[in-house]
Curated annotation (Swiss-Prot):
Protein purpose: Slowly voltage-gated channel mediating the exchange of chloride ions against protons. Functions as antiporter and contributes to the acidification of the lysosome lumen and may be involved in maintaining lysosomal pH. The CLC channel family contains both chloride channels and proton-coupled anion transporters that exchange chloride or another anion for protons. The presence of conserved gating glutamate residues is typical for family members that function as antiporters.
Name of this protein: H(+)/Cl(-) exchange transporter 7
Gene3D superfamilies: CBS-domain, Clc chloride channel
Motif (Selectivity filter part_1): 201-205
Site (Mediates proton transfer from the protein to the inner aqueous phase): 312
Residue ranges annotated as motif Selectivity filter part_2: 243-247
Region (Disordered): 1-46
PROSITE patterns, A to Z: CBS
GO cellular-component term (any): chloride channel complex
Membrane topology summary: Multi-pass membrane protein
Record gene name: Clcn7
Record-listed chloride binding positions: 202, 512, 600
GO MF term list: ATP binding; chloride transmembrane transporter activity; chloride:proton antiporter activity
Source species of the chain: Rattus norvegicus (Rat)
Length: 803
């Protein structure tokens, strides 16, 4: 522990020497004492009010599975919320990615014959096909609505600008532009801030956390999908520096989570299909497929979608899952391609593989030479530095928002302010620019003439007066001479800060396209410089360097290498640039990691989520399970009184949602581990009143099936909603049939990296720590492991907080 820099000590182990373990008194009979074996030592017991304390914290904010959201007390909003990035929130619960192999589960698995097994496998493939189809259709809907609304907006503004350019009074055009932008963003931010805040942003950090095993409330609900789709349409049409591609990953994940369950808890509709997949383990795999399908629909990159899900999302992987994810990705991009081709009148052409099509790069005209490799590496360095600056600025901006802009009304006002400022800055730059280019050969959809001569257009408007996707394609493919260096330099500088300010607003939006647009702008500027230095050599094409700059900037911000390389290759339909794109992305990641972590990881950290990386901190071998585990542990007996179980579940201090089950022995003998049972299982048992009247009787006649637990999943009722009479409190509950009789355990002397590897690789929620006699001495949960991380000064232990 010498190398551990402790910030605040919250672990219950620090109080072991200070507190004794008082007795738990039986509810309703104060003169009797009922032993509640806590496993902290031979015969150890503790009071009901002190069960499972985490340090000195007595109150823990419960997740939505514990509290009824309809009866939660109203939130109050202080003027400032103190926030420290060295915190780990207790409000997040873990998902059960390890199946509880109790008697019910094993009996069902034994009944599955070869035919039933094949049926389950076929259902998996059918679900993946449905995920791909629906994700593709949602992407089509977003694209068509954005194209029509944005086209209408830009036509109205263009006509207004053309009108007032001749007669004067362009300030009215500015007012119209800012008003239209603010109106769209107002609606988009209101529905996010007041209806479903988890729909804000791209959703990629939240999906990463879900696949990592963290339960993010409402992240894969139908309402979230509706708000996400509506919000991203309004954000893009509102002219913000955002893209619609990132949120497709979140949308695909929500679709996958819903389809795989065969019901909608939001709509209270159960279609009685796919019931076998109603558990976290199965849902996780389908959400991985949904994330990949979202990438595939966004960029027309099915292989890139699979690699994105592997690199950024899925924490657990196997060969069969790879095939199903690839299948969902291919179906998604084909559905999008087919529907958009019909919409554009080219039914048999299939020319729209993704929401954004970078266009084909001519390999012969734009081939690279060996002496350009150092130039590409230099561009990667620039992208890494600019990405680090972007992330650092966004970090401090997000900290400011957490502390001061936490009221929904303030969040809406900020979003409208950013929309108005974006329109104003764009108008001022377009108005001030005298960069006029010939209209002939231009790909601009809404060319603005302003003060240019007839037959010319303002090139600054080509970057600002368009959707970001079309602006990226223009920078890639417009012929040399379409932009002058001053225009590109000003656009890069201004759009960089606008995109940084915009990311983190309470709107549904992504950072993929803004990053590509910034990089394409300074990359094209880089290409113009190379062309000037080499005397307009044929290989110094600005479009090629715009592509490399876009890859460098995006890689410097999000720090993805493998998946981004393939996505860029598939989106450009050109394998030639695979090697230079990989070099650029790797260089950008290496350089950026020197200064600050990637944008998604940074926001996960700012939200204090107990996210587990692939490996434990490299300097953590000096720590053992004894030092990181939570103690004392609330244990239950095989045959436990209903009143005790109700009291344990009602006690907010015992909020680990899992309880070791120990053998029922005499008070003087040690309690050995027999199994583990989850809070959700106990809730279902109490709801169905699986009691016996006297402790010497067997189970009641009514036998629970695994279906009863699946029907309650995933929104288990809160303990407060289950009525247990005084007579029922005196009954006994036999946990033998429902507990997991073979939970994973580790000895006290196991090192932290070994505990971490076991916990992380198996997707555990609880890991029981036992002594040499198999007595429970502690419990390791996700938060116990996540609070150790490698800081600049060595190994740090994060503080635990309620929010």
């Amino acid at each position: 522990m010498a190398n551990v820099s402790k910030k605040v000590s919250w672990s219950g182990r620090d109080r072991d020497d200070e507190e004794g373990a008082p007795l738990l008194r039986r509810t309703g009979q104060p003169d009797e004492e009922t032993p509640l074996l806590n496993g902290a030592g031979p015969g150890a017991r503790q009071s009901h009010s002190a069960l499972f304390r985490i340090g000195q914290m007595n109150n823990v904010e419960l997740d939505d599975e514990l509290l009824d959201p309809e009866v939660d007390p109203p939130h109050t909003f202080p003027k400032e919320i103190p926030h420290n990035e060295k915190l780990l929130s207790l409000k997040y619960e873990s998902l059960d990615y390890d199946n509880s192999e109790n008697q019910l589960f094993l009996e069902e698995e034994r009944r599955i014959n070869h035919t039933a097994f094949r049926t389950v496998e076929i259902k998996r493939w059918v679900i993946c096909a449905l995920i791909g189809i629906l994700t593709g259709l949602v992407a089509c809907f977003i694209d068509i609505v954005v194209e029509n609304l944005a086209g209408l907006k830009y036509r109205v503004i263009k006509d207004n600008i053309d009108k007032f350019t001749e007669k004067g009074g362009l300030s009215f055009s500015l007012l119209l532009w800012a008003t239209l932008n603010s109106a769209f963003v107002l609606v988009g931010s209101v529905i996010v801030a007041f209806i479903e805040p988890v729909a804000a942003g791209s959703g990629i950090p939240q999906i990463k956390c879900f696949l990592n095993g963290v339960k993010i409330p409402h992240v894969v609900r139908l309402k979230t999908l509706v708000i996400k789709v509506s919000g991203v349409i309004l954000s893009v049409v509102g002219g913000l520096a955002v893209g619609k591609e990132g949120p497709m990953i979140h949308s695909g994940s929500v679709i996958a989570a819903g389809i795989s369950q065969g019901r909608s808890t939001s709509l209270k509709r159960d279609f009685k299909i796919f019931e076998y997949f109603r558990r976290d383990t199965e849902k996780r795999d389908f959400v991985s497929a949904g994330a990949a399908a979202g990438v595939s629909a966004a960029f027309g990159a099915p292989v890139g979608g699979v690699l994105f899900s592997l690199e950024e999302g899925a924490s657990f992987w196997n060969q069969f899952l790879t095939w199903r994810i690839f299948f969902a990705s291919m179906i998604s991009t084909f559905t999008l391609n087919f529907v958009l081709s019909i919409y554009h009148g080219n039914m048999w052409d299939l020319s729209s593989p993704g929401l954004i099509n970078f266009g084909r790069f001519d390999s012969e005209k734009m081939a690279y030479t060996i002496h350009e490799i150092p130039v590409f590496i230099a561009m990667g360095v620039v992208g890494g530095i600019l990405g680090a600056v972007f992330n650092a600025l966004n970090y401090w901006l997000t900290m400011f928002r957490i502390r001061y802009i936490h009221r929904p009304c303030l969040q809406v006002i900020e979003a409208m302010l950013v929309a108005a400022v974006t329109a104003t800055v764009a108008f001022v730059l377009i108005y001030s620019s005298r960069d006029c280019q010939p209209l002939q050969g231009s790909s601009m959809s809404y060319p603005l003439q302003l003060f240019c001569a007839d037959g010319e257009y303002n090139s600054m408007a080509a970057a600002f007066f368009n959707t970001p996707e079309k602006s990226v394609v223009s920078l890639f493919h417009d012929p040399p001479g379409s932009y002058n260096p001053m225009t590109l330099g000003l656009f890069t500088l201004v759009y960089f800060f606008l995109a940084c300010w915009t990311y983190g607003l309470t709107v549904s939006a992504g950072v993929f396209i803004p990053s590509l647009l910034i990089g394409a702008a300074w990359g094209r500027l880089f290409g113009i410089s190379m062309s000037y230095l080499t005397g307009a050599a044929i290989w110094a094409d600005p479009g090629k360097y715009a592509l490399m700059g876009a890859a460098a900037q995006l890689g410097g911000i999000v720090r993805m290498t493998l998946s981004l390389t393939v996505i860029m290759m598939e989106a450009t339909s050109n394998v030639t640039y695979g090697f230079p794109i990989m070099l650029v992305l790797m260089t950008a990641k290496i350089v950026g990691d020197v200064f600050i972590e990637g944008l998604y990881d940074m926001h996960i950290q700012l939200q204090s989520v107990p996210f587990l990386h692939w490996e434990a901190p490299v300097t953590s071998h000096s720590l053992t399970a004894r030092e990181v585990m939570s103690t004392p542990v609330t244990c239950l007996r095989r045959r436990e009184k209903v009143g005790i179980i109700v009291d344990v579940l009602s006690d907010t201090a015992s909020n680990h949602n899992g309880f070791p089950v120990v053998e029922d022995v005499g008070d003087t003998q040690p309690a050995r581990l027999q199994g583990l049972i989850l809070r959700s299982q106990l809730i279902v048992l109490l709801k169905h009143k699986v009691f016996v009247e006297r402790s010497n009787m067997g189970l009641v006649q009514r036998r629970l099936r695994l279906k009863d637990f699946r029907d309650a999943y995933p929104r288990f009722p809160p303990i407060q909603s289950i009525h247990v009479s005084q007579d029922e409190r005196e009954c006994t509950m036999d946990l033998s049939e429902f507990m997991n009789p073979s939970p994973y355990t580790v000895p006290q002397e196991a090192s932290l990296p070994r505990v971490f590897k076991l916990f992380r690789a198996l997707g555990l929620r609880h890991l029981v720590v036992v002594d040499n006699h198999n007595q429970v001495v502690g419990l390791v949960t996700r938060k116990d492991l996540a609070r150790y991380r490698l800081g600049k000064g060595g190994l740090e232990e994060l503080s635990l907080a309620q929010t």
